[in-house]
Structures are given as C-alpha cells and as structure tokens.
Amino acid sequence: MQKIGIGLAGLGTVGTGVYRSLLQNNLLLTERVGLELEVRRIAVRNLSAPRKVQPPPAILSDRWETVVDDPNVGIVVELIGGIDLPYELFQRALKARKPVITGNKALLAEKGAEIFELAADVNVPVFFEAAVAGGIPIIKSIREGFIGNHLQSIHAILNGTSNYILSRMTEAGIDFPEALQEAQANGYAEADPTLDVNGWDAAHKAIILASLAYGFWVDSRLVYVEGIEHVSAADIRFAHDLGYRIKLVATIRADSNSSVEVRVNPTLVPQGHVLASVNGVFNALMVRGDIVGDTLFYGRGAGQDPTASAVISDLAQAAIWIDSGGKAFGFTPHGLYGKCLPTDELVSGFYLRLTVDDRPGVLAQVAGILGTHDIGISSMIQPEGHDAAAVPLVLMIHNAPFGRMRTAVEEIKRLACVKGPPILLWILS
C-alpha cells in the first residue's frame, strides 16, 4: 500500500489535534482512503517548548522550510497563522508541486486570488475546509454538493465568540463588557478578542464563502463589516419586544443583476428564523440554491477537534489526488457574476434606537429628516418607565439603501433633541 508523507507547519492547538487524531484513527483512515498517511516532518517555533503530544524528535524542526523541502513529504499542512510567512510557504510548496492544506482564513481572504492563480498554473490543489466553520463541511458542500445550483443567498453565524457573548446578553440581560469577561473566563474568547468581536474573523470567512459561491475573489475593502461592541442589553431587550434576536450575521447574496452583496454586522433576526435559535459557541449556515432550496448546516465552528476533523478530511482528499492525479481543484473563477455591490447601495430594513428629550415634537423632527431621504417608518416603540429627561425612542425602518439611511442618521444625530450616539442595526430579510 502506498504511503504518503505529511508535513505539519505548526503544532499549536489545531496542529496538536491533527497529529493526535492521525495517530488515533490511522487504521480507519487507511481503510477508507486506501492509502497510508504518515507524518514525516513537523515545524515548530520552539523545539524545547512543552507539548501535549510527543512526536519523535527526529522529525521536529524549527524551520518551516524543512517541511516543504523534505522529499519524503507529499502534502504540506499550514497551521502557522498570520499572512506573510504562510504566503511564502504556499508559494514554495505549490512550486514544488505539493498540495497545501490550511485553516488560515485571514491569509485566504487577503491573498486568495494570488494563491489560487498560482495553484491553477502549476495544477496543484489547495484545500481549506478548516478555514470556515470548523468541522462543518461547508467548503466541500459549496464546491461540490451545490455545483449545479445558482446560490441565491447564504446567511450565517460564523463566529462562536460573538455568538456566545450575544447569547449571554440575551439570557442574562447583561451588557457587552460583562458578557465578554464571562466568555474569556470560560475559555470562549481570547485574551485579545478584537477580531472576534469587531466582525473581521467572520468577515474573512464570508469572503471565502462568497468567492467560492460567485466565482470571483472578493476584495475585503468592499465588504461592510461591523462588530458587536456597541450592542447593549437595552437593544437586546427592545429587539425581543419587537419579535427579534440580535446575532452577528454574515449576509452573502446575489441580486437580479448578478451583483453580489457581502457584509457582516449585528442583525435583528426574526425569532421564528432558524438562526435565532443558534446559541452559545455554535455556528450555523443557511444556504439557498435555485434548485436545492434551503439547506441548513450547524455545528461547532472552532476548537481543536472540529478544526482537526476538517484538516484530516482535506488530507484524505489530497492523498487521493496524489494517488490518482487529474485536474487540481481549489477555486475556479468564472464570469457569471459581476462585482460586489458598494456598501451604500445595500438595501435592508433597519432598527434605529435614539436617546431623545422627553418632550412633544421630537418624533416629528426625526420623521421629517427620514422623510426628506424617502425613508419610511414601519413601527415605533417608546418604552415607558423612564424618569430621566432623556428617553429611548426605537424606530423600525422600511427597506432603504444603506447610504441614504446613513446620511439621514448623521443629520438626526445633529438635532438638539438627540442625546448620545444613535444605534443603527440591520434587519434580516
């Protein structure tokens, strides 16, 4: 039976899970794939650091180049993180005609076009199931399972940390700082949670999904990204009273002109929608195709074992490609869809919360500004029980282009009767 050598660049949390799982399920993999997979080289940052697994010292190195250049390594697994160094690894490995597996969403979001152009030139596959939604096989599903569908939309919860925080804010009525502190104490948020809570972790994943779905590599500068830091317990409560839950949602969809919308932002999700019931650290994706209709994917989107599972799935596919040859696959560009819609042209309903003076005429001033921008109010709540001179005013806005809505909010903010910054959230449609 043919043996195929694996090189791991990185032995951190995910790398450790991959190495352990390969040892644990080696016989199962061999029987299912018909090939024997063997780790032959591992690159680590510090050779003397303590580890939860103990590979043979002879296969360890503190230089990633030894993984790529080893003639006994046929598949390279990039688990280093970052952009510049992994990009260099990709170039070197692909030019050596070695398939590369990665879970590096930031790298693919920023350098995907260049990576896949090189991969196509040398006819070597790139695998990246672990880059989006952990153990949920969404990449394979879009690339293969839905290959005969025009994908009309993807709505997804793609970041477990932000979803945990919003879930705790909903369940316990606490504000963002307290929920974040709880997430960190329970190991669901990093010491530096910036990319999780500012929306960019989910945005990197959304860029990858949109690029696969629509056949052109999406420029991150054209993606609207907003985090959850400004969402308050009051917004959670008001949204609930209106029949919604607030989630950080990635919205990816094509319009009738074949233009593509890609955004990530806190979104009011109707309580009856399936995404509204996705709580804690779980991820979920609802994919709508013109033939298949609605499909739902749900599971753990991060963590050692779910991510390792995705990497091992890719290892099996890479080994089969080496054994059988054929055309490499990864990302196939095409011209069926034209461009990303500019942010200001994106259309949605909106939730607008203002803090205003408690006196007659305030609503008329706000509605007047909205009206001058051809923006309509669908409903309004003004919660009672506030003794202060300033009170909350919550407006639900009919569908409108974001550019017009943003301009109107800037004008409303300058009214003397408005106290504090307005809160504007999108509504799932």
Label the predicted regions.
Residues 265-290, 304-305, 371, 376-387:
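Low-complexity, glycine/alanine/valine/leucine- and proline-rich hydrophobic stretches
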Residues 85-96, 103-143:
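Rossmann-fold NAD(P)-binding glycine/threonine-rich loop
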Residues 120-201, 208:
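Rossmann-like NAD(P)H-binding beta-loop-alpha module
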Residues 1-95:
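N-terminal glycine-/serine-/threonine-rich beta1-alpha1-beta2 phosphate-ribose binding loop
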Residues 178-277, 282-284:
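Substrate-binding/catalytic subdomain of NAD(P)-dependent oxidoreductase enzymes
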Residues 310, 315-429:
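A conserved regulatory-domain signal marking ACT and ACT-like small-molecule sensing domains
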Residues 293-295, 299-305:
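Glycine-rich phosphate/pyrophosphate-binding beta-alpha loops
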Residues 100-101, 377:
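A short hydrophobic/small-residue beta-strand
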